Regions:
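Acidic, glycine- and Ser/Thr-rich low-complexity intrinsically disordered tracts
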Residues: 3, 11-35, 249-319
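Extracellular beta-strand/beta-solenoid scaffold signature
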Residues: 30-36, 54-61, 79-88, 102-110, ...
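Right-handed parallel beta-helix
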Residues: 43-54, 66-77, 92-103, 114-128, ...
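Short, well-ordered beta-to-alpha junction loops that form the rim of enzyme active sites
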Residues: 227
Length: 319
């Protein structure tokens, strides 16, 4: 483990292309065995090259820290709901990249933090149970620089117990620098009747964008706007085959009318092919309580061009 000045700053990074982010093979990664890592109030550190078994708690836990880089780590095998891969609390400027995370309750759980940059990781089989079960969840995160970019996420039915693949809860980006979920590959979800692909605006929030993601059989839904202001779903590809728990490909529906508004919504240039449990095409739904949805007629609902072959048969190459 290297405890040095952080080698990557979170803010000011340009967004790499999807092709660049998704060609990482992890083939040359080597790891040093370690017990769980926990730091509170330690700034300017790099945690690199560790193999950690999570056990009953987080594999890596960081709180009250500034400028942290977690890279090329292997974090596996949690035994309960507390065993997340990486837990962040009240942190600023954290980069998590090129990590392999497998069989934990949640991959990355960031709470009350800002500038959290999660990029080019591979994660397999989130075990939950709820309220965990995400590859990445932002809870009350805020400000610029919060990004989830170019990761590969896969849940295998019977080996996982996921909720949302990505969940953005009560979190706020800023104008010109939204919380960005871009160019991720997501495959597998269910059988949760509440979980699915990417949830924006979970109990409010502002300035969140999901773009250029590919989701194959992500669960009950593909991408959702559950409330919030300045929310965007653009240029995504979503496929869902009929299963007993499937519902809808993309929806906008304020599920929190008593506590959060829902307005200034864009859903545009998406390609969706999603079959509900009843066997009918159900690629989109407008719940009618988020105002006018910009771009709604510019999507390709029910297109056969989106199918399971848009992602490679072997997606997770790390071990």
């Amino acid at each position: 483990m290297s405890i040095t000045g952080a080698t990557a700053a979170t803010t000011g990074l340009t967004v790499p292309s999807a092709a660049t982010l998704n060609t990482n093979t992890f083939a040359s990664a080597t790891y040093t065995p370690s017990g769980p890592v926990k730091y509170d109030g330690v700034n300017n550190i790099t945690i690199s090259g560790l193999s950690i078994t999570a056990g009953s708690g987080p594999a890596i836990s960081i709180s009250n820290a500034i400028n942290v880089h977690i890279t090329l780590c292997r974090l596996v095998n949690g035994t309960n709901v507390d065993a997340v891969g990486i837990y962040l609390f009240k942190c600023t400027n954290v980069t998590i990249d090129f990590c392999y995370i497998n069989n934990v309750s949640t991959g990355v759980y960031a709470s009350t933090s800002t500038g959290v940059y999660v990029a080019s990781n591979q994660m397999l089989n989130m075990r939950g149970p709820a309220p965990r079960g995400q590859f990445v969840q932002f809870n009350n995160c805020y400000g610029p620089g919060n990004k989830i970019l170019g990761n590969r996420f896969e849940n295998v039915m019977g080996q996982s117990n996921p909720e949302d693949a990505i969940n953005i809860y009560r979190s706020n980006g800023v104008s010109g620098n939204p919380i960005m979920i871009q160019a991720n590959w997501i495959r597998g979800g269910g059988p949760s009747k509440s979980g699915g692909g990417i949830a924006l605006g979970d109990d409010g929030g502002t300035y969140q964008t999901a773009s250029d993601n590919v989701l194959i059989n992500p669960g009950q839904y593909g991408i959702a706007i559950a409330s919030g202001t300045q929310m965007s779903i653009v240029n995504n590809q979503i496929y869902g085959a009929q299963a007993w728990y499937t519902n809808v490909g993309i929806f906008a529906w304020n599920q929190y009318e008593s506590s959060a508004g829902c307005s200034i919504i864009t859903i545009s240039n998406n390609q969706v092919n999603f079959t509900a449990a009843g066997g009918y095409q159900n690629s989109s739904w407008n719940g009618g309580n988020c105002g006018t949805i910009n771009g709604w007629n510019n999507n390709r609902w029910g297109t056969p061009d989106v199918n399971p072959t848009v992602l490679p048969s072997t997606m997770i190459t790390a071990q």
